[in-house]
C-alpha cells in the first residue's frame, strides 16, 4: 500500500536519539495506528509495548530481534515482526525509511 486514505495524521513528530530517528503517527478509522519515519545512520535500541511490524520503505537496516544471537539484514520491500513487551536493536548504515504497524 503506497498511500493511506481517510486517516488522521498527528502533526507533531515523535523524536528519538537527538533527532536521528523521527516519525509521524497515522491513526485509522478503526483506531489502529502506524508510524511513518526516517532513521539516520547510527545504532539504536527500542522497547515495544504492543507487537509491531516494521516495513522497510527505503534503505536497509541490520536488526537484532528479541532472543536472537545473530543480526539479520532487511531491505526495501521487506518487513519483520517484533513481539509486545520486548526490545530490539538496529544498526543503520544509510538513511532508512520505514512504516511501523502496531498490532492489537
UniProtKB/Swiss-Prot annotation:
The keyword Signal does not apply. It catalyses: a purine D-ribonucleoside + phosphate = a purine nucleobase + alpha-D-ribose 1-phosphate; adenosine + phosphate = alpha-D-ribose 1-phosphate + adenine; cytidine + phosphate = cytosine + alpha-D-ribose 1-phosphate; guanosine + phosphate = alpha-D-ribose 1-phosphate + guanine. SUPFAM superfamilies: RmlC-like cupins. GO terms for cellular component: cytosol. Belongs to the nucleoside phosphorylase PpnP family. GO terms for molecular function: guanosine phosphorylase activity; purine-nucleoside phosphorylase activity; thymidine phosphorylase activity; uridine phosphorylase activity. It is an enzyme of class 2 (transferase). HAMAP family: Nucleos_phosphorylase_PpnP. It comes from the Bacteria. It comes from Syntrophotalea carbinolica (strain DSM 2380 / NBRC 103641 / GraBd1) (Pelobacter carbinolicus). Keywords: Glycosyltransferase, Transferase. The lineage of its organism: Bacteria, Pseudomonadati, Thermodesulfobacteriota, Desulfuromonadia, Desulfuromonadales. This is Pyrimidine/purine nucleoside phosphorylase. CDD domains: cupin_PpnP-like. Catalyzes the phosphorolysis of diverse nucleosides, yielding D-ribose 1-phosphate and the respective free bases. Can use uridine, adenosine, guanosine, cytidine, thymidine, inosine and xanthosine as substrates. Also catalyzes the reverse reactions. The keyword Electron transport does not apply. Its EC number is 2.4.2.1, 2.4.2.2.
